Amino acid sequence: MSDIRLDSATFFKRAAKIFDSWEKPSGDTQALEDINSIAIILGDPNDEVASYTKTTALQLWLLGYEFPSTLMVFEKSPRKVTFVCGSSKAKLIRQLQPSDGIEIDVKVRSKDATAAKETMEEVVASLNGKFGSLPKDRPIGKLVDEWNSAVESKGDLEVVDVAIPISAVLAEKDGEELKTIITSAKLTSTVMINYFKSKMESIIDRGTKMSHEALAQLVEEKIGNEEKGPDMKLWNKNPSLGEIDFASSEFVYSPVIQSGGKYDLKVTAASNNDNLKPGIILANMGIRYKNYCSNMGRTFLISPSKKQETQYTTLLEVRKEALALLKTGAVASDVYNSVHQSLETKNATLADSFLKNLGFATGMEYRDSSFLLNAKNNRELKENMVLVLTIGVADLPDAKNKGKTYSLLLSDTVKIGQNGAVVLTEGCTRLSDVVMDMEEEEEEDVKPQIDKKPKINNSPKKPRSSTVGGRVLNAKTRGANREQATQTTAEKIKTNQQRLHAQLNADGVKRWEADAGGKNGAQQKVVKRYESYRREEQLPRAVEDRRIYVDEQRQSVVLPINGYAVPYHISTIKNVTKTEESNHMVLRINFQSPGQIAGKKEDMPFEDPDANFIRSVSFRSQDQRHMLKVYEAITALKKAAVKRETERKELADVIEQEKLIEVKGRHPYVLKNVFPRPGPEGKKTDGNVEIHQNGIRFRPDGPASKIDILFSNIKHLFFQPSEKELIVIIHVHLKAPIMLGKKKTSDVQFYREVADMSFDETGGKKRRARYGDEDEIEQEQEDRKRRAELDKLFHDFARRIETAAQAQQFELEVDVPFRELGFNGVPHKSIVALLPTTNCLIHISELPFTVITLSEVEIVHLERVQFGLKNFDMVFVLQDLKKPPVHINSIPVAHLDNVKEWLDSCDVPISEGPVNLSWPAIMKTVNEDPHAFYAEGGWNFLTGSGSDDGSEESEEGSEFEGDSDVFDESSGSDEDSESAFEGDSDSASAESLSDEGEDWDELERKAKRADEKHRTDRGGDSDDDGKKKKKGSRR
């Protein structure tokens, strides 16, 4: 508390306002006339009733902070304010030095009961006759008991309720207060219009099941709290907000969302656990900013009747009249009666259901009942008062749903002016803003469905989040027009692919245009200089023996050549061989030199490739033991050097993450009892995942190292439910790899096994009392229930990670795989299930993981696509041409059409061919001069059909050659391997592709009939015939 500074100027300014109203009472402050002192006491901090009470409001208004267990006594003449509180609070309050004719007296309440009692009696002794208080706040605590005891002991004191005079003083806002309330109102209207409205419409439109309470929680999280920051993506949508101190922001109450025929328009209403339903939806929410409250309430009409629209329009008219009546000098009861009478004239039914009040004053205290806008309140409204105006009608009979009712509501925060009220929470009031007609949209979608589909596919490039969803719907096309739909799909793919390939080639030429005519596409190789010894004196003494010496410390080999000791760094040595000849041993040392036959690795760069190089040097010696020792030393040194260089290259892209900033003040959100993969120490370790301010942390239960992942390094966040799996997963794919133990990784996941939640009741009473399948059925039901609970737990936690990351201005969304679009393949060594997501193709169920980001894919080439083969391969060429293509092999041919349709829907260029290609050679050619590659047609060579010669090369990979028949577009085409978008011939039509499986079955049946006929003709007595028949039946 030492860093708290009180605003002395504000305190004395506002205290003077109280004394001025006290010395010249009029109107609502008339009750202060016969009072000589006012005692305001706030009880213990755990007093839940103290929330938004007048006592709290007065303390915040004067001091800017809440001081629990504190007594304030105002004395009229002379002007004096006495504080009774603990020592720590007294130290802060003593910042207030006497000023503007107001004395300050701070009395420290002792921890000793006797001394505390004497202090309180001393304060009470200064009171005479009547004194003002706020008895309705009902504070509790030891300080309150001491005060009540001292007042009773004196006996001649009379308590007067000064709630109305205090309300009158607080009601009129100054410039700073109005500025803060306007900011509070902007926050409220922003979250209502820019988040709740769109979120609610999305839930209704998609038919998502979400409870009122859950939706209210999502709204409440947008403001942020101590565990996570605010959602700046939302708040930045309102540029008029400016700089906001979100630490001083909170919701006045949890947002109230109501639908489905159950409505409560009272201030005490709360969201229930029922799901959000179409129809009439009411939403109320309010934000408190720097202790000042605002409120906003709206009615949203989903497929309303004409009557409901008329009723809402009537409320808008009445609201407009009410705003005109709320001006300086107006009486609260007159305003209510005029509005009610106007409504009765327009619609008597609505008037009968009209609320009993139009609203209330607000500010530091959310609801000040002293200024209720009802028929009985005769108090005048003053300029710069701030009210919550509520126009509402309750329990109207619903003609659509007999037996049910609905309510309509419009609530705003308004400021009283000379000529009427100004709305501070404007927006989303017009009928067009709040009406959402679902039925008309459905009717429009049904009729022109077939006509609209081609237009959708020919439209400009769409976000991938929508295309994947569209793919799911397209896959469900059924009915009499199946062949027409299939043909339409093939034509759409063909048209879209032509556009994508043209765009790909044009973008490639433009991207590499700066390198035209040069070889800058390939990465320039750096010539490394090595200096084993700077001076001759540094050579080891062992070289004086004129023998080969291996210097491990300098990573060099010193060779005796013509009487001189010549050092060679180990990097210049390619390898060493030894040959035994009778009594001699020959040691041959081969050096790195240009012009050698290139293997899989790139050639070593040389400063001057045209210089003279020694390729090898041989030494012959009778000391076989020494030569063997030298051989082993050089070999070991070379292996160590190669290992170091390999590790350096592997760790080149590993980053050093910034420090994780932990959440302070509260415990972070935690997902307990999970296992990370890969493990921090290479072992299976359980622990908890925590969400902190700028990232997530895995905290192991054992001695293993913790894992920190920053939001800035998260590229994709996946949630994979336990459907058809034994585990439920939250998977993080990183932008740059990090070190886990001694290994680097680009993927970290946290999972929990579903099986470990199961248990058996073998031997229990229930098991012995039942027989049959009842136990198994019950166990299956329990298993499904546990799976659903676990999925929800992990999905909610993934959503919390998403929210926390977005609050830190990172674009991160939870991606869930589409299992219905999945297919099997071999990305590494074994067959696994590969699942498309909105942005990726993934396999995260087991190690090693596969995550391919579709936005980084240049083109996808389908290999071994030809009639008769059961599998095909898929090659992802990445936009970063330096990276090797990603291969997924042995995909069942039954998934070919679905894979092509999915890739096309994601706007990924596709090509296909009958054989495997030599991709290292292709990529080497591309990287040598990318501009020339794209200028000469780019990847168009992949879209040509395979030649007749190439059709015989079944599953073996072919070497890439620029003039190969495989890529010669003028060569003959194989109709069976032709792609769906590669020609207009009837043989390549969508119909023949879709019926390919049926043709094969028909051929098999014909072969079987021919075998039977052949066996009959031969008399059926040949063993060979029998064997052939059996073999044919298994074909």
Curated annotation (Swiss-Prot):
Domain of life: Eukaryota
Acidic residues composition bias: residue spans: 949-985, 993-1002
Alphabetized Gene3D superfamilies for the sequence: 2.30.29.150, Creatinase/methionine aminopeptidase superfamily, Creatinase/prolidase N-terminal domain, FACT complex subunit Spt16p/Cdc68p, Pleckstrin-homology domain (PH domain)/Phosphotyrosine-binding domain (PTB)
One cellular component term from this protein's GO annotations in UniProt: FACT complex
InterPro entries associated with the record: Creatin/AminoP/Spt16_N, Creatinase/aminopeptidase-like, FACT-SPT16_Nlobe, Fact-SPT16_PH, FACT_SPT16_C, FACT_SPT16_M, Pept_M24, PH-like_dom_sf
Localisation per UniProt entry: Nucleus; Chromosome
Coiled coil spans: 637-657
Ranges for region Disordered: 440-471, 944-1035
Location (main, coarse): nucleus
Keyword annotations of the record: Chromosome, Coiled coil, DNA damage, DNA repair, DNA replication, Nucleus, Transcription, Transcription regulation
SUPFAM superfamilies referenced in this protein's UniProt entry, alphabetically: Creatinase/aminopeptidase
GO MF annotation: an example: histone binding
Pfam families: FACT-Spt16_Nlob (PF14826), Peptidase_M24 (PF00557), PH_SPT16 (PF24824), Rttp106-like_middle (PF08512), SPT16 (PF08644), SPT16_C (PF21091)
GO BP annotations listed: constitutive heterochromatin formation; DNA repair; DNA-templated DNA replication; nucleosome assembly; positive regulation of RNA polymerase II transcription preinitiation complex assembly; regulation of sister chromatid cohesion; transcription elongation by RNA polymerase II
Biased composition (Basic and acidic residues): 1003-1027
Function of the molecule: Component of the FACT complex, a general chromatin factor that acts to reorganize nucleosomes. The FACT complex is involved in multiple processes that require DNA as a template such as mRNA elongation, DNA replication and DNA repair. During transcription elongation the FACT complex acts as a histone chaperone that both destabilizes and restores nucleosomal structure.
Subunit structure: Forms a stable heterodimer with POB3. The SPT16-POB3 dimer weakly associates with multiple molecules of NHP6 to form the FACT complex.
Family statement drawn from the similarity comment of this UniProt entry: Belongs to the peptidase M24 family. SPT16 subfamily.
Record protein name field: FACT complex subunit SPT16
Organism: Cryptococcus neoformans var. neoformans serotype D (strain JEC21 / ATCC MYA-565)
Gene that produces this protein: SPT16
